[in-house]
Amino acid sequence: MATYILFWNPGISSYTRDRFICDFDEREDVGNWSFHEHEEVKAGDTFYMVKCGEGKTGIVMRGTIESRCYEDEDWSPKRRHPIYYADIETDICINPWSEAALLTPELLTAKLPDFNWHGGHSGRKLDGAMAQKLDEIWFSYLDSNPKMFSNEEAWIWDKSSLIPESVKEKLIEKRGRGCEVCGYDYARVFGPDCAGHNDLSVSPRPLKSPILKRLFYNICLNCHQAPKGKCWWIR
């Protein structure tokens, strides 16, 4: 699957600040977005949306593209033709008008200097290596900033496909292959040959609580199904 970078300047976009705030509060999707490199876009691809223009700038959304591109009227008064759009569904959204710290164009440029993170055409495709690196940077950033989810400055859907497998494996290895709640670990009991079985039973899951210093914790299925009110699973 491919990864595309979308740009949003609320100062000139038909998707205004007020529309964003309304969608953010209701946890609604923006619907669709325009793509400059539209030829190969398909359902299942990933998008990141970067806010540019005035005020705080940086990544404010990550999600999944839900359709191939289709031609429609220009969203701007310029009446350009043709303009191609694809439907998008947001998995993670951050309010740039809150106190949440964004993953800024400057930080992205320092890590991925071969892409213009400050603006330009929306809907540009990243190459595979750059897309994988961006995923690692993004989920590390989220992991280090859990308070924005507790403070309702951001929201996230707990989907099984939320974390890419390459990132998930690194998170599991980084903290050990056991559950961080109960310590459940196949390899510790049955030996290293069974380590791979943990992938089905232990995975990084997003939690929100004012006392937690990380967002993602390796949790087994049993602990993940603890009664509501006992844990802070992000829904």
Description of each model-found segment:
Residues M1-A43, T109, L126-P146:
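Compositionally biased, charged N-terminal/linker segments
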Residues K51-K56:
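Short, charged beta-turn/beta-strand-edge "cap" motif at the junction between a beta-strand
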Residues G58, T64-K125:
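Aromatic- and Lys/Arg-enriched surface recognition patch
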Residues E73-W75, V189-G196, A226-R235:
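Short conserved catalytic/interaction loops centered on acidic-Pro-aromatic/His motifs
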Residues N145-G191, P206-L212:
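Short, charged surface segments at domain edges that flank catalytic/cofactor-binding sites
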Residues N198-R205:
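Histidine-centered catalytic micro-motifs used for acid/base chemistry in nuclease
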Residues P206-N218, Q225-R235:
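Polybasic, low-complexity binding patches
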